[in-house]
C-alpha cells in the first residue's frame, strides 16, 4: 500500500545550524545531515506518478546541506512524483552559499507545477533573536520571483512555540503557546493508494517520519509514525 497523494510534506535536510538563537523550537543543533537512503526510502513509499501539493525543506539551516535539496529533486523525478510547490527558509548567514541555494531553488521552481500563483517561496527569516542578515544575502535572493518576506516576525507581538530553547525564555516577557499537531487525515483510493489530504507528513534528518513539523528534536519522538527504513 503506497501513498498516491500528500497535501503537505516536509523534509529536514540537516540538524546543523550556524546560529544559536535563544528561541529555537528545535533545541540545540546537532551535527547530523539527512542521508540519501532516508530520502529514497521515504519516496519509495509513494506510488509512481504520485502528487505532493507542497514540499518544504527545513533545518537546522538548509544552506548547510544544499546537496540534499538537489538529491530530493533527482529522486522525485526518477519516481515520476509531481510536486505543486516548494518552500524554503534560510537565515541568510552563509553568504557564500546563497547563490548556490538560489540556483537549487530555481531548479525546483522549474520542476514544480504551481509557478504562477506565488505558492513557491524562498525566504530569509528575520526576528528579534536572529543575527543581522547580511546585505549580500538579501541582494542575491531579491531577484527571485518567489523571494518573499513572510518570515519576518516580531515576537513581542507573536507567540513563541514553547519548544526547544524557547522553554528557557521568560514567559512574563514573551508570549508562548504550546505546539499543536494537526491530525494526519487520509482516505483510500479505489486502487488502495493513500491520500494524506490534511496534516503534515515530515521526514526528519534521522529518517523518522513524524506527524507535524513544528516540534523540538525531543518532541518528534512522541509523534513519530515509524522510520523510513522500516520494512514496508
Where are these regions (language model features)?
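Non-cysteine beta-strand/loop elements that form the S-adenosyl-L-methionine
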Residues: 114-130
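C-terminal accessory region of radical SAM enzymes
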Residues: 149-182, 214-232
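Conserved alpha-helical substructure of the radical SAM core
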Residues: 1-88, 95-100
